[in-house]
Amino acid sequence: MAQNGTVKGFCVLLVVLGGLVLAGPAARAGEGAEVRGIIQKVEELRGLRTGHPLAVSTLDAVAMRGVVARLLERERGSETEAGWDDALHLLGVLRPGQRLAQVERGALAGQVAGLYVPRTRRLYVLGSGGSAPRAVVAHEVVHALQDAHFQLTRGPLAPRPRDHDGELAAQALVEGDATDVQSRYVASLSPLDLVGELGRTLGALPGGASAKTAPFLERQLLFPYTAGLRFVRALRARGGQRLLDRAFRNPPRTTAAVLDPARYLAGDPPPQAVRLPAGSYRFATSFGAEDLVALTGEGSLGRFWLGGRMGVGRRGLDMRLATRGAASVAAALRRALPASAAIVFHGRLVCVRIALDKASVRGVSCR
């Protein structure tokens, strides 16, 4: 997973939140023949074949936390991370003194059940006594197949710091595919396997509950799995495996297309171009339909979104959104953003400015 910079381009995480594995209970997986059996079943379900042996490491909770911490550390200090820190503070998502990397570590510490690292082509899965739940192995095997056939860190699936919305949409395709295969794999297990291995699966659940994560960040953490799963199932229902594989070569451009698969199936129109006010921005990226929904907590606004950008400069934060219902979007943003935010709209354009000194900004232009 790589929400807002979480291990972007280095690994894909299967996250366990609230004590629930996203795909449900699964059976035991050790080394050797059993793992090969899981790989063969996943290949059958996904319609892809591995081109090389897969390296699978089963870790205990302490070792898994160490792997995740090292991967998070690789991204520290980047300009993108600093830009997100500033933006999320100004938007009121982060509290004074908080840092995005700190929140991410807290949210993910002890909550990761498995990950695949494209750089090393290694799968790490959490297990008890040397055994990992089969569903976790299956999920990460899908990522290995995706990487072998479509390259998770290059081309259309590569990280895009200046297009956060497009990057999140592509991530939803990746995680939705893995979650879909994972759930179908679990459904293929016998009732005896499911019941008999429930205790082992619960024993392998990550521990160390994290502190409460801000709703915006929590939703973006789950979005690739939940919305991505619905998106992938819609593609498979329309065009089967061929359409899904085509989507990996032409990922959804926006989270609006993930939230509404009909948009993607109708040709996946690009977002409406939106320009920020003239000035120098040390950080600028797209602000998408999912960002709008996560920030306001109002799911219906996703269908209003047409395009958007956000930038942070010396003056503070500027945001421009093209929408179908500017008055409704502006009203929702007024409810969600700090009181210091100046929010106006003109026609279909919604304009937001939040000053670095938290002072109210007057006379914001929205032309």
What is the meaning of each model-derived region?
Residues 28-99:
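A metal-dependent hydrolase signature that marks the N-terminal structural subdomain at the beginning
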Residues 42, 135-152, 178-179:
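Active-site recognition of the HExxH zinc-binding catalytic motif
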Residues 52-71, 159-165, 195-205, 251-252:
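Acidic helix-start/capping segments at beta-turn-to-alpha-helix junctions
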Residues 80-118, 276-317, 329-333:
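Short, compositionally biased low-complexity segments enriched in polar/charged residues
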Residues 123-138, 169:
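Short pre-active-site segment immediately N-terminal to the catalytic Zn-binding motif
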Residues 148-153, 157-201:
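Post-HExxH zinc-binding segment in Zn-dependent metallohydrolases
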Residues 208-315:
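Pan-zinc metallopeptidase signature
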Residues 308-367:
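C-terminal soluble interaction/assembly domains
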